[in-house]
């Protein structure tokens, strides 16, 4: 009550901030008349003037009014588009490192030019992040005309482009690309063997288009670069044959072999199911005779394959979650309906689905590098984003990314009509109503966009419309190539467009069809009269569609997130145009069945409803929205859970990547190598000659043999110590250190100091990369089973942190030993031989990256489903703390505390490796 009273008196925080920004808008507008008088050359010279001001110490904030005014005037001259006042506000919000919520059709692409231009003046690079390659190339080409005119360079990055071209694109003032490409290039750069092989020059400022799609929807899917692992594909096929012999239970208590947790996306074997599975596995010869338990240590691989096969059959549907094309299983993005060619689910799930569909099973992969979008985008020194729908996720943006959401007013009032949901008993009644609505719109000349949640439904609707002889277009993963054309025509009178889950997002649907598209199709020699005739015809179509009610949106199912529903609705009513929307639901829809059906069924029974009857009531809509909020909270918990685990990996990743950067930047690492060698020798001597021990406990022959076998150093220790009095462990360590130092000095003298320095760097990088790769595999195994610690009354996350730290420390100790042993064993005789070795290694990395898979990690890959259940049993408040938001990852100083959490200084802990 007090909050609402204060809001009425002083306005909301959003309103107060808008008032502050409006005062800056007035300053920008005051400069317009003066800038309009400038010649093109004088206006273009402003860019050089701004750059000089920045070098002289002037801040970007001080430059903002004039820079925005220059960008607006340049846009008017080059693109024929002048920024509205609300677009200036949107640009300021983006510059301030916030999220601008702007409705569809408000010109987000044009808004971005303002902060992009201003921040690119600093010369550190600006990344404009889009959801697909088509939008990246389109926006780079279109807006690139403006930036180039103003004297700034523009690049675009996409998969498969030549190395030198990609380096040039990242070297440009402004770089366009997808979130995946920026992420994978970051990981690739941290696998590079020299500075010259790296693409990026640091992550300074990013503007994320459709920020909710990238930072929320895709936050559960880490980016993974993986290479082939040594795993037999035959086992997937053999285990797959067993699944049809297992019986699915209706629920956890019912009879059968396994039950499906649709909320947690998990499949669980019952006690009976375990016995039945063991019996079938024995019959198939997969479990050997004498193996009395499926869960015996030697059978963990079989359990892994069985779980993957169960999930493939029970949770993943063809033409919903994936399609089969050209003998391959191709993932369908659940949020956009697009295919994700080249992406593979991990943890053996993709192979299990291949076995289920009877297509060739490809080898399982080993993780080489990975990062979540959450941690990738938190590396940027400044981050901002724009979307039509962010306010419903404002808490998540603030708590995870430290990003505040500001709602930007529309240029014209929204007049779209959002009708109440219509709820039916079953799907057939629902789709009959949908078809009638579509036919009614088509007859009246009103364009209609039908949003579906899967390819299967879109094709079913298409078949019904074809039989009814209703002309229509289908936009889903299978028609990706025609996407822009279909969207451009979706606003034509009577046009019917079926779109899978917001595919085509990023292109406005213009009432009457896209005028630009029609003009572009004109003959290059067309006269002004021809162009006028085309524009007149378009105006007639535009007015006819407005008179028919504008674009009508039909939703065939509620999505898990209200935001996705709002995105679909937001396609209508752009820039003050008329429009309408309605969702058609049934009790058989996934969301209704899992979360909302009981209450609605009760209402329907009380009302005596029969098949074909419909409920249209705001109370039902509110109940459904409550169900959606439940799912949103559940999905937030999963994303937060993923982040909690990945934050552990992220601290380790930062240490390893920081060390790689130091290695690549350093001219010489001789001091580091000497320090590591002495530490390794001390540990080796202590192993055979323990401190404070008597000589009877020493194993001098073992020490001598190890130095010979691992180091190639013949050191007759026993003879050297004969006749000496008061020999202790410290004296022996000194003798060994001295001998090894002389041995290394002799090797350096024989091949030359320069070659030795190059060899040290090469060996350190190679061994560190190999150790990190093996550590990632170990962490994967740890993560997959960590939820089981909950049964031992232990906190899985705390156990994961503890064991991850121990594993990381062991990995670094192993790296130290292996580096010194490798340097002792490698035989290099000349600089030419060293150069050949480096080139071979570089080619191997290039080949590995070409053969690698760029994957989406399966959402439950962090034990999320199991742990989410165990977290619900905790006392209130446990595990609820919000992680501190880290927006930047500065270089760790040698005297700073080590990021691993040991409490030691960095130089005495993990910094010692480099």
Curated annotation (Swiss-Prot):
ATP binds at residues 87, 105-109, 508. Its EC number is 7.4.2.8. One of its GO terms (cellular component) is plasma membrane. One of its GO terms (molecular function) is ATP binding. GO terms for biological process: intracellular protein transmembrane transport; protein import; protein targeting; protein transport by the Sec complex. Zn(2+) binds at residues 898, 900, 909-910. Belongs to the SecA family. It is found in: Cell inner membrane; Cytoplasm. This is Protein translocase subunit SecA. SMART domains: SecA_DEAD, SecA_PP_bind. Pfam families: P-loop_SecA, SEC-C, SecA_DEAD, SecA_PP_bind, SecA_SW. May bind 1 zinc ion per subunit. Keywords: ATP-binding, Cell inner membrane, Cell membrane, Cytoplasm, Membrane, Metal-binding, Nucleotide-binding, Protein transport, Translocase, Translocation, Transport, Zinc. It is an enzyme of class 7 (translocase). Its cofactor is Zn(2+). It is a peripheral membrane protein. SUPFAM superfamilies: Helical scaffold and wing domains of SecA, P-loop containing nucleoside triphosphate hydrolases, Pre-protein crosslinking domain of SecA. Part of the Sec protein translocase complex. Interacts with the SecYEG preprotein conducting channel. Has a central role in coupling the hydrolysis of ATP to the transfer of proteins into and across the cell membrane, serving both as a receptor for the preprotein-SecB complex and as an ATP-driven molecular motor driving the stepwise translocation of polypeptide chains across the membrane. It comes from the Bacteria. Monomer and homodimer. Part of the essential Sec protein translocation apparatus which comprises SecA, SecYEG and auxiliary proteins SecDF-YajC and YidC.
């Amino acid at each position: 009550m007090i909050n609402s009273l204060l809001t009425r008196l002083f306005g909301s925080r959003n309103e107060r901030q808008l008032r502050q920004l409006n005062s800056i808008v007035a300053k920008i507008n005051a400069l317009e008349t003066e800038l309009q008088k400038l010649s093109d050359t004088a206006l273009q010279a402003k860019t050089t003037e701004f750059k000089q001001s920045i070098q002289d110490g002037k801040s970007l904030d001080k430059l903002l009014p004039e820079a925005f005014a220059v960008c607006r005037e340049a846009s008017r001259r080059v693109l024929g588009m002048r920024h509205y006042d609300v677009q200036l506000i949107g640009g300021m919000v983006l510059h301030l490192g916030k999220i601008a919520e702007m409705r569809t059709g408000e010109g987000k692409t044009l808004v971005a030019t303002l902060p992009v231009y201003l921040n690119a003046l600093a010369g550190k690079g600006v990344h404009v992040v889009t959801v697909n390659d088509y939008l990246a190339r389109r926006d780079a080409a279109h807006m690139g005309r403006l930036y180039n005119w103003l004297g700034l360079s523009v690049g675009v990055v996409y998969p498969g482009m030549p190395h030198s071209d990609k380096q040039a694109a990242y070297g440009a003032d402004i770089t366009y690309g997808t979130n995946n490409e920026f992420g994978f290039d970051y990981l690739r750069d941290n696998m590079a063997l020299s500075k010259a092989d790296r693409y990026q020059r640091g992550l300074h400022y990013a503007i994320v288009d459709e920020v909710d799609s990238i930072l929320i929807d895709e936050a559960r899917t880490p980016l993974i670069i993986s290479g082939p692992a040594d795993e037999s594909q035959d086992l997937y096929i053999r285990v797959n044959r067993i699944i049809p012999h297992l019986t699915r239970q209706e629920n956890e208590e019912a009879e059968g072999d396994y039950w499906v947790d649709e909320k947690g996306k998990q499949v669980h074997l019952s006690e009976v199911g375990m016995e039945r599975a063991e019996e079938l596995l024995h019959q198939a010869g997969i479990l050997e005779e004498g193996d009395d338990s499926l869960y015996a240590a030697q059978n963990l691989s079989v359990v892994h394959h069985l779980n993957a096969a169960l999930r493939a059959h029970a949770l993943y549907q063809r033409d919903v979650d994936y399609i089969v094309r050209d003998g391959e299983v191709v993932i369908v993005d659940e949020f956009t309906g697009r295919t994700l060619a080249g992406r593979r689910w991990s943890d053996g799930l993709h192979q299990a689905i291949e076995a289920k569909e009877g297509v060739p099973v490809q080898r399982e992969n080993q993780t080489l590098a990975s990062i979540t979008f959450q941690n990738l985008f938190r590396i940027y020194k400044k981050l901002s984003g724009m979307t039509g729908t962010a306010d419903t996720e404002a808490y998540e943006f603030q708590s995870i990314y430290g990003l505040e959401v500001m709602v930007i007013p529309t240029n014209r009032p929204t007049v779209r009509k959002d009708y109440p949901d219509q709820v039916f008993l079953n799907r057939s009644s629902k789709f009959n109503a949908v078809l009638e609505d579509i036919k009614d719109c088509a007859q009246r000349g009103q364009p209609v966009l039908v949003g579906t949640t899967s390819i299967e439904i879109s094709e079913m609707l298409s078949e019904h419309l074809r039989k009814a002889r209703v002309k229509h277009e289908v936009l889903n993963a299978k028609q990706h190539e025609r996407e822009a054309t279909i969207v451009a025509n979706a606003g034509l009178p009577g046009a019917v467009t079926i779109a899978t889950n917001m595919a085509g997002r990023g292109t406005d649907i213009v009432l009457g069809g896209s005028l630009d598209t029609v003009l572009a199709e004109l003959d290059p020699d067309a006269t002004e009269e021809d162009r006028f005739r085309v524009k007149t015809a378009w105006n007639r179509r535009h007015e006819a569609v407005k008179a028919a009610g504008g674009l009508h949106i039909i939703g065939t199912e509620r999505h898990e997130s209200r935001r996705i529903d709002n995105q679909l609705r937001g396609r209508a009513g752009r820039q003050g145009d008329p429009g309408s929307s309605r969702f058609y639901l049934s009790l058989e829809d996934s969301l209704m069945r899992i979360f909302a059906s009981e209450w609605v069924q009760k209402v329907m029974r009380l009302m005596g409803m029969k098949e074909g009857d419909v409920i249209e009531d705001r109370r039902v809509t509110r109940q459904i929205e409550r169900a959606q909020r439940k799912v949103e909270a559940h999905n937030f918990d999963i994303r937060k859970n993923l982040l909690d685990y990945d934050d552990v990996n992220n601290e380790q990743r930062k240490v390893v990547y920081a060390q790689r950067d130091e290695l690549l930047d350093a001219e010489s690492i001789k001091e580091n190598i000497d320090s590591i060698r002495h530490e390794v020798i001390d540990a080796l001597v202590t192993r055979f000659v323990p401190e404070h021990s008597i000589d009877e406990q020493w194993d001098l022959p073992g020490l001598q043999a190890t130095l010979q076998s691992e180091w190639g150093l013949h050191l007759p220790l026993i003879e050297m110590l004969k006749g000496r009095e008061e020999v202790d462990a410290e004296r022996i360590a000194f003798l060994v250190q001295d001998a090894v130092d002389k041995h290394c000095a002799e090797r350096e003298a024989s091949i030359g100091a320069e070659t030795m320095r190059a060899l040290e760097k090469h060996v350190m990088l190679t061994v560190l990369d190999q150790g990190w790769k093996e550590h990632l595999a170990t962490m994967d195994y740890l993560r997959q089973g960590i939820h089981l610690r909950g049964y031992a009354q232990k906190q899985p996350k705390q156990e994961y942190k503890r064991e991850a730290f121990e594993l990381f420390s062991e990995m670094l100790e192993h790296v130290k030993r292996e580096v010194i042993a490798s340097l002792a064993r490698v035989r290099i005789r000349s600089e030419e031989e060293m150069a050949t070795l480096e080139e071979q290694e570089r080619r191997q990395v290039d080949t590995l990256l070409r053969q690698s898979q760029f994957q989406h990690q399966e959402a439950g890959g962090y034990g999320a489903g199991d742990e989410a259940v165990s977290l619900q049993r905790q006392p209130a408040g446990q595990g609820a703390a919000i992680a501190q938001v880290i927006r930047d990852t500065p270089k760790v100083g040698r005297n700073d505390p080590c990021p691993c959490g040991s409490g030691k200084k960095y130089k005495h802990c993990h910094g010692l490796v480099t």
